[in-house]
Amino acid sequence: MRRTAVAVLAAVMTLAVVPPAASASADGPVVSTDKGAVRGKVTERVRTFGSIPFAAAPVGANRWRDPQPVTAWRGVRDATTPAPACAQTSQLGQPASETEDCLYLNVTTPAQRSHRTRPVMVWIHGGGFTAGAASMYDPSWLAANNDAVVVTVNYRLGVFGFFGHPGLPGSGAFGLADQQAALRWVQRNARAFGGDARNVTVFGESAGGLSVCAQLASPRAAGLFAKAIIQSGPCGLTLPSFTTPGEFTGVWRSRADTEKAGTGTLGCADLACLRAKPVAELLTVHEQFASPSYDTAVLPIDPVIAQRTGRIHRVPTLVGSTHDEMTLFAPLFWPQPIPESAYGDQLAWIFGADAGEVAARYPVNGNDDARDEIARVLTDRSWACTSQTTRAELGRYTRVSGYEFADPDVPMIFPGFPPFPDYGAYHGSELLMLFDLGQTLTPAQRQVSDYVIAEWGRFARTGDPGWRAPVQSLAPGAIGGTDFALDHQCGFWSSIL
């Protein structure tokens, strides 16, 4: 989340144009899109097409402008390398990018011919709205095992995607507009890759899940998808401000607040000055613009209000989280162990007058490091019970299913993290079940991965993930219904919020 969010960032790839091929085939390496032909790669299991432009380069006059149409090309465009990462700073030792020309997507399909159109799954990556890239995620398992077309998309981040300024059309919502441009590309081109434009599932994790919340609330997204999956991005997510005891702040920001924040940025009095700034200089204020804005044409109202009042696209929706979301962030906020004697003071800093009730409900466990208790408290308060609220409120208007990824021994996918009492099923850990991230899974974890891939695919085809429990626990040897609200003490949290 925000500046402390962790994302494994992709290396920047180059794109070239190659000579035209003799013909284009729906199940071969060359496919004709609405703007020109692309040549990808074919393996025994999948076809992959990388760096396909879905909007014009957002540079020069197009910086801080809604995505513009791509100019058609002649010949066959090379699509054998993944999309480059959008401009972003280095986070936790991961590489930065200064690539502003980044509005590309990647397509993965099964290699074999199909006589019927396939469901399409469009992935929106996470990274706190300031980091991440489509090319981080290899969806080969999802595509091949589910006979699906999987599209991973880039969108502008941070100061390039969510900047605002008085008089600037689209202030604070350019990244969301990019996601919609990618979804419109899918509507126009799904069939060329064997996909069914009438059966598109949009799914994402963390900031990607929050993006799905925004698209559910955006009138401009009408008809662009038929199903939605929100992974660890509950629409009403709030986190401690760490400035005022008891104050929690949400993700979404009004357009007026975003424009106020953008006024005078880098000493510029107008947009012409800002558009002339090099990428590297703009990246010095990158993390200041990590909140999508409502009161905009793309997002007219706060998604929290939209979900509560039913002003959403009423499509089948799957909403879930991991059992130990906050363990990923706790060592970033608190790098050193916290003596249990200081537990009460830390809770007072976070919860103000409610700290005593929280401490009584969540006692220390005797390991003389209170960070794991704090992580559990914030997992329940900020992530789990907010996910439960998202399910309940969306469920008044559309069909909603739930899951919780709960493997306590899942491998760590983020390199270089400091020691912590128990990471458990940390934020982002379920990604290992869906994508090939280069980690080795045990046979039992592989079985969970196979189950998750199959049920995500079932949901993409039918809108039904295949279980009847309100919340399905996903863990080795323990796949089945769980009393989620009781486990995460959501009754307690609703009583004090």
What do the predicted segments below correspond to?
Residues 193-206:
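Alpha/beta-hydrolase fold nucleophile elbow
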Residues 126, 174-178, 206-209:
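Active-site loop->helix "elbow" adjoining a glycine-rich segment at hydrolase catalytic centers
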Residues 209-221:
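Short glycine-enriched nucleophile-adjacent loop
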Residues 25-172, 442-455, 460-467, 492-495:
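Non-catalytic accessory segments of hydrolases
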Residues 1-24:
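Secretory targeting and sorting signals
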Residues 98, 384-497:
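Mobile gating loops/cap/lid regions near enzyme active sites that modulate substrate access
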Residues 91-93, 188, 222, 231-346, ...:
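Substrate-access "cap/lid" subdomains that shape
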Residues 102, 171-191, 254-260:
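Alpha/beta-hydrolase active-site loop
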